[in-house]
Regions:
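N-terminal mitochondrial targeting presequence
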Residues: 1-66
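Nucleotide donor/acceptor-binding cores
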Residues: 84, 112-115, 140, 353-354, ...
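Conserved phosphate- and dinucleotide-binding cores of soluble alpha/beta proteins
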Residues: 47-54, 64-71, 77, 92-108, ...
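N-terminal low-complexity or amphipathic/hydrophobic leaders
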Residues: 86-103, 343, 350, 355-386
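Glycine-rich phosphate/diphosphate-binding loops that line cofactor/substrate pockets in enzymes
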Residues: 74-85, 176, 349-354
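Beta-strand segments within the central parallel beta-sheet cores of soluble alpha/beta enzyme folds
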Residues: 113-118, 377-381
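Cofactor-pocket helix-loop regions in the catalytic cores of large enzyme subunits
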Residues: 67-73, 333-356, 363, 552
Length: 555
C-alpha cells in the first residue's frame, strides 16, 4: 500500500505536536485505502528553553583541545554575555574569585548587565566578593542564603532595588550538586512549615502603597511542592545550573585539575560542575602531573578556563587568642558574665566523643568550658570537622575560617571538605548536637532566628538545615533570656518567621534551663541560675511552663 502524497509533511514544521488516528484494512488492493484516516493537529508545543531562539545558552563557547590557560582574567571573561547566570564560589570572602570579579566589574554595566548571581553570600562589611557587582548595578538578581553584614545589599533589597531569592545554605549546595549531576529536583526536610515552603519570603519589594508603611511585594517567593515519605513531610527543590562558574583554587594544573586549601573549597567544586563554563583563578598554575592524583579535589573535566590569581586574599574577620597563660580574665562586664554562664551550661550538653555543630555567637564559647577529659569533634558548616580554637597572631591563616567567617585553627585529625559533603552530615542526622542562637523560641519548640520583617533581613544561612533533622540531632538553643529592648525571647507562639517548626529540645539562657516537649508542646523549667527565682523567670517569659519537682541549680 502506498500512502497518499497529500499527507502533511510534518518533519519541516518544528514545534508541532501530531495526533494521528489510523484505521486501515491493510489487505485491501485499491490504490487508496478507503478506511485510512489521518489528521494532524497543529498545537502550540510546550516552550523548550533549550531550543527557543530567545533562550539560547548565554554561556561562552567551549573549545576542546585548546589551551585552558588564559593570559589574564579580562581575556577569560570578555565573552560572558548580559543576562547570564553566574555561580560565584566562596564563603564570605574566603575562596572568593576576587580577580575574576574585578574583571567582570571592569566590563561595566554598559557591556555586562542583568546578571543573576548564585552565591552563599554577596559581599561583606568590607570591600570584596560580589558586593562590587551589586553596587555597580551589573547584578540585578541574587540567589543566596545569607546577607549578613552587607548593609548596602540589605538596604537595596528593602528599597526594592534588587531581587533576592533566599535559600538555605545546604539547599543551595544540594541544588548545585543536583544540577551538576543531571538530577532535575529532589525532596528535602529543610524549610518545611516555614515561609520558605509557602513562598512567603518576597523576592522583590516595591515602595509602600499610599498610606502604608510596609513595602509592596512585586514578586512573591516560590511555593514549594510537598510530599510525605514515611510519615514525614518534605519539600521539593529544583536543581540550579549556571552559564558560568567562577572560583579560586590553590594549585591548578594546565589540564584544569584543582587543589584547594582548607575551607576555600566550600562551593567551588559543586559550582564548577553545575556550570556550562567554569573559570578558575589559580594561586599557582603548575604543569600537568604536578598535583598527585589523591590531591586532586576537582577534576579537569569540569574546568574550562584558567587565569592567574592576581588579587590578594581578603580576610573578613581576624579573631585571635592570647598566648597560653596571658589571657586577661579581669574586669568582665555583666554582659560577658551572662554569656559565659550560658556557654558554661551549654558545654554540659556536649558529651565525650560527640560530633557537634555550634552556631555563631554564644554557642561558639561553649568548648572553652569543656572539662579536659571531654573531647568533642566540632563541625562547621563551611566545611570543617575537627575545628579548634582561635589562632594566635602567628597562626592566622585566611584559608581557615569558621561559619562566622572568623579565623580558627584545626585540631589533629581534622578534615576539610565542600559544602555538599558538609550538609550531608547535617541533614543526614550524623551530628549529635547542634547549638544555635535565637530571636524567639516557641513553647512547642518552634525556632525563629534569621529575620525581623521590615527591619532585619540577614538570611537563614545554614540554620534551616541545622534544625532539619531534630529526631536524630538534638537542637539546643543558647540565648539571653530577653532581647535588648527587654522583650521576651521565649514565647507561647513565635510571631517572627520560623527557621524550623517543633525542632528545639533544650533552651539555655542566663536565667534558667527549659526542656521542651516537641511532640505535645510545652515547657518545663528544670534549672535556675544562682540568685534567680521562679517568679523572675515568669515575669520575663511570655509562655506558659511547668516547674520540675526536682528543680536544680544551674551550674
Amino acid at each position: 500500500m502506498s500512502l497518499s502524497r497529500r499527507i502533511l509533511n510534518t518533519t519541516r514544521l518544528p514545534g508541532l505536536r501530531i495526533t494521528s488516528s489510523i484505521r486501515c484494512q491493510w489487505g485491501q488492493k485499491s490504490r487508496d485505502c478507503r478506511h485510512f484516516q489521518s489528521y494532524a493537529r497543529l498545537l502550540e508545543a510546550p516552550r523548550n528553553p533549550y531550543k527557543d531562539e530567545e533562550n539560547v545558552s548565554k554561556a561562552p563557547k567551549i573549545v576542546r583541545g585548546a589551551s585552558k590557560v588564559y593570559k589574564n582574567a579580562d581575556e577569560a571573561v570578555a565573552d560572558i554575555k548580559s543576562g547570564s547566570t553566574i555561580l560565584s564560589a566562596g564563603f564570605g570572602l574566603c575562596g572568593t574569585a576576587e580577580t575574576i570579579i574585578e574583571a567582570l566589574e571592569r566590563r561595566g554595566p554598559e557591556s555586562l548587565h542583568s546578571l543573576t548571581a548564585v552565591s552563599n553570600n554577596a559581599g561583606a562589611s568590607i570591600p570584596g566578593g560580589l558586593g562590587a557587582l551589586t553596587q555597580s548595578g551589573q547584578v540585578n538578581r541574587l540567589i543566596l542564603s545569607f546577607i549578613g553584614s552587607n548593609k548596602v545589599l540589605e538596604k537595596k533589597y528593602l528599597e526594592g532595588k534588587i531581587a533576592i531569592e533566599l535559600c538555605p545554605q545546604g539547599t543551595i549546595a544540594e541544588r548545585l550538586r543536583a544540577g551538576g549531576a543531571g538530577i532535575p529536583a529532589f525532596y528535602t526536610p529543610t524549610g518545611v512549615s516555614t515561609l520558605l515552603q509557602t513562598g512567603g519570603i518576597p523576592t522583590r519589594l516595591g515602595p509602600p502603597a499610599e498610606g502604608s508603611k510596609e513595602n509592596t511585594v512585586l514578586e512573591k517567593g516560590q511555593v514549594r511542592e510537598t510530599r510525605e515519605f514515611d510519615g514525614k513531610t518534605y519539600s521539593m527543590e529544583k536543581a540550579i545550573k549556571g552559564d558560568v562558574a567562577i572560583l579560586r583554587a590553590w594549585k591548578v594544573d594546565e589540564a584544569g585539575n584543582c587543589q584547594f586549601r582548607y575551607t576555600t573549597r566550600t562551593f567551588g567544586p559543586i559550582m564548577a560542575k553545575a556550570a556550562k563554563v567554569a573559570i578558575v583563578e589559580a594561586e599557582e598554575i603548575v604543569p600537568v602531573g604536578s598535583i598527585a592524583p589523591a590531591d586532586v579535589h576537582l577534576q579537569g573535566i569540569y574546568i574550562d578556563r584558567i587565569v592567574p590569581a592576581t588579587v590578594p586574599k581578603k580576610l573578613e574577620l581576624k579573631k585571635t587568642r592570647a598566648p597560653e597563660g596571658k589571657e586577661d580574665t579581669s574586669n568582665k562586664s555583666d554582659a560577658i558574665i551572662r554569656r559565659d554562664r550560658i556557654a558554661r551550661r551549654t558545654a554540659k550538653e556536649l558529651k565525650n566523643g560527640y560530633y557537634v555543630n555550634l552556631g555563631i555567637g554564644i554557642p561558639t564559647l561553649a568548648p572553652s568550658f569543656l572539662s579536659p577529659e571531654t573531647k568533642v569533634w566540632i563541625q562547621s558548616e563551611n566545611g570543617i570537622l575537627g575545628m579548634g580554637a582561635y589562632p594566635t597572631e602567628e597562626e592566622v591563616d585566611p584559608d581557615i575560617i569558621n561559619a562566622g567567617k572568623e579565623t580558627v585553627t584545626l585540631i589533629p585529625g581534622a578534615s576539610t571538605f565542600d559544602s555538599a559533603e558538609s550538609f550531608a552530615m547535617i541533614r543526614g542526622g550524623h551530628i549529635d548536637v547542634s547549638v544555635l542562637g535565637a530571636l524567639q523560641v516557641g513553647a512547642n519548640g518552634d525556632l525563629a532566628n534569621y529575620m525581623i520583617p521590615g527591619k532585619i533581613f540577614k538570611g537563614m544561612g545554614g540554620a534551616m538545615d541545622l534544625v532539619s533533622n531534630p529526631d536524630e540531632t538534638k537542637i539546643v538553643v543558647a540565648t539571653e533570656h530577653v532581647a535588648k529592648d527587654g522583650s521576651a525571647k521565649i514565647v507561647q507562639d513565635c510571631s517572627l518567621p520560623l527557621t524550623g517548626a517543633k525542632v528545639v529540645s533544650t533552651i539555655i539562657t542566663d536565667l534558667c534551663v527549659f526542656e521542651v516537649d516537641r511532640i505535645n508542646g510545652g515547657l518545663t523549667l528544670t534549672e535556675l541560675a544562682p540568685g534567680v527565682d521562679v517568679e523572675e523567670v515568669r515575669q520575663k517569659t511570655d509562655a506558659k511552663f511547668e516547674v520540675a519537682s526536682d528543680i536544680k541549680s544551674m551550674e
